[in-house]
Amino acid sequence: MTLLEVCCGNPESVDAAVLGGARRIELCADLEADGLTPPTAWIRDAKARYPSLTVHVLIRPRAGDFVYSRAEADAMSIQVEEALEAGADGIVLGALTPEGDVDVPLLERLVSLVESYNLAAELVQSDLCHAANDSHFFPGPSRRVSMTFHRAFDRCQRPFEALEQIIALGCDRILTSGQAATAEAGVATLRELQRRAGGRIGILPGCGVTPGNAARILAATGCTEIHASASVTRGGKKVTDADLVAGILSAING
């Protein structure tokens, strides 16, 4: 089954995404500014009300470009730690240099926080498994937090070089429109990214995805996941529409 990730910019959008059938969301705030780091209360609320929902959390301290100061980098580190503590299943991050390359030192810093969390979770799980041998208690699998490099990728000056850097950093996927105005317009680049990735990292097409074009984008690129806000504007803000979510899922999965 092809997976749809729904970008949710507020708690009511989480409800709509789940109602429409979504199994994974990207949670952010202020979707009107292309998404900012959400309050930790939103993360906890989503996980408490929908325990089986996979919640990926955007880390973006401000609107504008993706070139961050030292103070902003410090804030992002804190936001990653807070999101992990709040129960995030995935962290969505990205940063660039003024020249339009991946900010490898900052990304290494943020990725190391997630990797340290995952290592600690593995150690805890190992201890539980040892205990299970004595108590006949068999715990479920430990939670591994995944990492997505977000659409800062679409501003990279050398996308194929950036692809290799992001793979080396250990990210699980790249959210991208193929450096075009929409994912549908960027299918040629998306297809080439998918080819070059060779299964080493997922390519997640996003931007302008609708029930009418989602299946075409997937067929043209060979990607196995897709990202959409599935949103409408109500009361001056973007909110997820359950019918649009259901429509995309129907289009990509029949």
Range-by-range predicted roles:
Residues 84-120, 138-162, 166:
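Hydrophobic, well-structured mid-protein blocks that either form specific transmembrane helices
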Residues 26-36, 82, 86-98, 171-184, ...:
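Glycine-rich phosphate-binding active-site loops on the catalytic face of alpha/beta enzymes
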Residues 46-107:
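Glycine/small-residue-rich loop that forms an oxyanion/phosphate-binding "nest" at active or ligand-binding sites
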Residues 12-16, 67-79, 157-169, 193, ...:
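Catalytic cores of alpha/beta
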Residues 56, 60-63, 197-254:
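C-terminal alpha-helical cap/extension of soluble enzyme domains
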Residues 2-6, 25-27, 55-59, 91-93, ...:
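Hydrophobic faces of well-ordered beta-strands that scaffold small-molecule active sites
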Residues 11-12, 31-53, 71, 97-117, ...:
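Active-site-adjacent beta->alpha loops and helix N-cap segments on the catalytic face
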Residues 19-28, 50-53, 87-90, 144, ...:
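Glycine-enriched alpha-helix->loop->beta-strand junction motifs that scaffold or abut catalytic
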